[in-house]
Amino acid sequence: MAENNLAKIQFYEGTDEPVVPEIRLTRGNDGTTGQAIFIFEKPQALSSVADGEITGMRMIDAEGEILTREVKVKFVDGEPMFLEGTYIWKTKSDFDRFMRFANSYAKSNGLGYSEKK
């Protein structure tokens, strides 16, 4: 459970990622399936002080943890620049749970939401 009801993201267990990502959502035509793509520019997880192997992205809030293993590093001029995590949902309940995390994360980080028209 998250302390103080603050939602957070971790790439290393017990270490919060301070860089706030750009988050893009897409949903399937049936409205049940979809994905959220998190793009972190110059995340601390890729810094020289980071220690260990990234095995996934943990989204943690007061309800618990959502885990995805879909994490990629993108390089620019040979240097790690972006970390991209993708969470895929296959049911409405998975989507609803993700949206509760997303709303909590937005509140914890002073973020807003805009819908693409």
Swiss-Prot record:
Q: How does it sit in the membrane?
A: Peripheral membrane protein
Q: Mainly localized where?
A: membrane
Q: What is this protein called?
A: Photosystem II reaction center Psb28 protein
Gene3D superfamilies listed in its UniProt record: Photosystem II Psb28 (2.40.30.220)
Q: Name one GO cellular component term.
A: photosystem II oxygen evolving complex
Q: What species does this protein belong to?
A: Prochlorococcus marinus subsp. pastoris (strain CCMP1986 / NIES-2087 / MED4)
What are the record keywords, sorted? Membrane, Photosynthesis, Photosystem II, Thylakoid
Localization recorded for this chain is: Cellular thylakoid membrane
- Please report which protein family the annotation says this sequence is part of: Belongs to the Psb28 family.
Q: Which gene encodes it?
A: psb28
A single BP term in Gene Ontology: photosynthesis
Q: Which domain of life is it from?
A: Bacteria
InterPro entries, from UniProt? Psb28_c1_sf, PSII_Psb28_class-1
Pfam families given in the database record: Psb28
The reply to whether Nucleotide-binding figures as a keyword in the UniProt entry is no
